[in-house]
């Protein structure tokens, strides 16, 4: 082997470490379709280039512990098919099914783990289900092994389930690597919960990545109930933060590429005993949302309406006070800074819960402002715009090619009237393409200019969000 050949494996590792893109894992809550018209998000209205992985939440497990299913209401709305349509715009988009969630609890998972036969059957049936509905992978979101009725032995058994998944996925015959299914696990990243629920070293070997829920560090469920931000970026105390937990997971020996940092697109609220409460003050319970979380698309309305936004210096995250309600959340600035943490430390990427909670309608400004902030923070804005503009041109080119085929067809059939009609349509499409290309050239110049400045600059922290 010559010197240059011996360098090849090393160079490949360098490329994978520093040149490959980041994961942008976006959970999509199926129930988002049933919100009021302004906040409802249909699958077809999702920008197909915002995410590398679009994760449907949630699939459930039947009473036998051997099969996955989704509520009939989702099947009736053909949500899977509508999500698949996004691939016509972006063929590289990965569609993933997340199974579990908080509402499902532990009982169904324990049924899966009841025997080795159950686990084998569940995994094989799951793979069939994924292939039937054209999913690219599965995300296991058990909340949480060894808790909520789950036995201590389930920690070890969950590892066994994951090992069976890995084995069955590896032996599945596929045309090429692009068809391989991916396997991820959504976890509570705190030291106590993750150590109690998971055999991290064994699981890590068998999954593609972790989706770390870097939120809900605090909330109305704590005793005593104190006002605290639920997703602090940094902290000078012993309180959990995104920065410290990310370090902990790397120190555990988890490869950086397998760590996706979770960002909440919702706020956590408290009803306070006194107005203008601050961090550490006692709270009476959850705020007006009843503890379910307030979508950022709602919070931006309040800020645009004049509610003053504040910033926590130690935690580097924002909050608002609305009467006796205190709400901690993430805004475009804090989201971008969390994404920059991922970029600077070469972690695997970002996970968001959930894309349907972003301002997808553009009521407060640009559409999907938090996702766009993530793209800027990861340094992927140029690639995103390149893909988006190319897809826009390709849609028109497809219509041009179709019109050309129809001209040929009608000419061969001797139908000059229809051939002329198609020629007119073809000319209109070509004119439209020229106009789009002219507009895109201006857009691209602005993109390049912004990239030369290091990305869209952040204003001062005193500048209200959704005003820049």
From Swiss-Prot:
Residues 386-440 form a coiled coil. GO terms for biological process: carbohydrate metabolic process; chitin catabolic process. One of its GO terms (molecular function) is endochitinase activity. Residues 22-381 form the GH18 domain. Its EC number is 3.2.1.14. Keywords: Coiled coil, Disulfide bond, Glycosidase, Hydrolase, Secreted, Signal. The keyword Hydrolase applies. Residues 1-21 form the signal peptide. It catalyses: Random endo-hydrolysis of N-acetyl-beta-D-glucosaminide (1->4)-beta-linkages in chitin and chitodextrins. It is an enzyme of class 3 (hydrolase). Disulfide bonds join 26-51. GO terms for cellular component: extracellular region. Prismatic layer of shell (at protein level). Expressed primarily in the mantle with highest level in the outer epithelium of the mantle edge and lower level in the mantle pallium. Chitin binds at residues 73-74, 100-103, 144, 213-216, 353. The active site is at residue 143. It is found in: Secreted. Belongs to the glycosyl hydrolase 18 family. This is Putative chitinase 1. It comes from Margaritifera margaritifera.
